[in-house]
């Protein structure tokens, strides 16, 4: 397996784009893999393709649309009203059950066929919005499972696991891509590029993080 190459699970959003450039700094060769999972806003994949082109990394897309049909969630179901806050005692309906499990499992198979053992994902337990598949315990467990399942030595890297959105913006700035991430990524649950709609949960988290980082930077 090639220890100088990494595969980034890449959506074209703030977190995965930060991880893409983090991977470029830490590995000699980087691949980016995006997924069509039945999301309402498939524009994100085209933006991901363009960002990967600018980053000069190899880009691929896998169609896993069946994931969106397995359970109800507001990111794939056009009839569902999006939760604006995390409901008490349950995950928000923006949670796509099994998404990170499927993405990382498929990414591992994709990586294995190319001799890659480093996988990079932008999950964060600090700002995980209540999603169970963004927790460190899940990632560590899946890492062990993938290695046992394929008799390989995969390493799942989570550069954002223990940092909040303000610190994620700080990392983007350190990597020299703050403006690119602010203007060219798509994090908004309503499918609006850049600063987004400004009021969905993803935009709120992103905006508050940026404001906190810029305030600290300008002190």
Curated annotation (Swiss-Prot):
Sample GO molecular function, one term: ligase activity, forming carbon-nitrogen bonds
Keyword Ligase: yes
Source organism per UniProt: Bacteroides thetaiotaomicron (strain ATCC 29148 / DSM 2079 / JCM 5827 / CCUG 10774 / NCTC 10582 / VPI-5482 / E50)
The protein's name in its UniProt record: 7-cyano-7-deazaguanine synthase
Keyword vocabulary terms for this entry: ATP-binding, Ligase, Metal-binding, Nucleotide-binding, Queuosine biosynthesis, Zinc
Disulfide bonds: none
EC number: 6.3.4.20
Transmembrane segments: none
HAMAP family linked to this entry: QueC
Binding site for ATP: 10-20
Cofactor comment text: Binds 1 zinc ion per subunit.
Cofactor: Zn(2+)
NCBIfam families per the UniProt record, alphabetical: 7-cyano-7-deazaguanine synthase QueC
Family: Belongs to the QueC family.
